[in-house]
UniProtKB/Swiss-Prot annotation:
This is Hydroxyacylglutathione hydrolase. The keyword DNA damage does not apply. Its cofactor is Zn(2+). PANTHER family: HYDROXYACYLGLUTATHIONE HYDROLASE, HYDROXYACYLGLUTATHIONE HYDROLASE GLOB.
Length: 251
């Protein structure tokens, strides 16, 4: 299987998995044009589309792709049923695509119906988990997002985190504002800064590394607890997550 990223809009990535036969899976095609160009350039045969949630920058290209390739099966959560989804999937179910079984994981927070797809080592996590960050809470609560991230963080160490936006540099600037002396965060920030200076992608990331540099996955880390305790005493990791998310919203 080959993993490909297609840039779209200002900072979106549309992920495409293809096998040796050229069959492909498309994830969150917010715009059809760059996908159609990539399909033509690589001679891919689209088999399926995965949708993680209903926002336009993730679903906007579906109808045009289905019109061009009517055999495509479009998997998505209930909230995408009016966006072109033909196969609604929910937590605990599986989607069998390109000979691989993808587990569906409910991850409410960014939207109430947001889902992710996992088939080792690939995690397509939409706008739930970003490198160095997490999605804004447009519909869900901080508690829901905390539980969603906890699920994703429990996946195998070698999981490839394929998120939908190039937010890594700004996320790492925020992480440095919280833990300015953390060695892992500083090292990763320098690496990301170099990549972005060359206009190179920072994704996918390996989950084992992400747990070290993403403050939203470190709510039980003593260094982070000490920083938060300087401002307010919060006993529960969920409360510390909510504190971080609120800080990031104002950053």
């Amino acid at each position: 299987m080959n993993l490909n990223s297609i840039p779209a809009f200002d900072d979106n990535y549309i992920w495409v998995l293809n096998d040796e036969a050229g069959r492909c899976l498309i994830v969150d095609p917010g715009d059809a044009e760059p996908v159609l160009n990539a399909i033509a350039a690589n001679n891919w045969q689209p088999e399926a589309i995965f949708l993680t949630h209903h926002h336009h920058d993730h679903v906007g290209g579906v109808k045009e792709l289905v019109k061009k390739f009517p055999q495509i099966v479009v998997y998505g959560p209930q909230e995408t049923q009016d966006k072109g989804t033909t196969q609604v999937v929910k937590d605990g179910e599986t989607a069998f695509v390109l000979g691989h079984e993808f587990s569906v994981i409910a991850t409410p927070g960014h939207t109430l119906g947001h889902i992710c797809y996992f088939s080792k080592p690939y995690l397509f996590c939409g706008d739930t988990l970003f490198s160095g960050g997490c999605g804004r809470l447009f519909e869900g609560t901080a508690s829901q997002m905390y539980q969603s991230l906890k699920k994703l963080s429990a996946l195998p160490d070698d999981t490839l985190v394929c998120c939908a936006h190039e937010y890594t540099l700004s996320n790492m600037k925020f992480a440095l504002s919280i833990l300015p002396h953390d060695l892992s965060i500083n090292d990763y920030y320098r690496k990301v800064k170099e990549l972005r200076a060359k206009n190179q992608i920072t994704l996918p990331v390996i989950l084992k590394n992400e747990r070290q540099i993403n403050v939203f996955l470190r709510t039980e880390d003593i260094d982070l607890i000490n920083v938060i305790n300087e401002e307010t005493l919060l006993q529960q990791p969920e409360e510390r997550f909510a504190w971080l998310r609120s800080k990031k919203d104002r950053f």
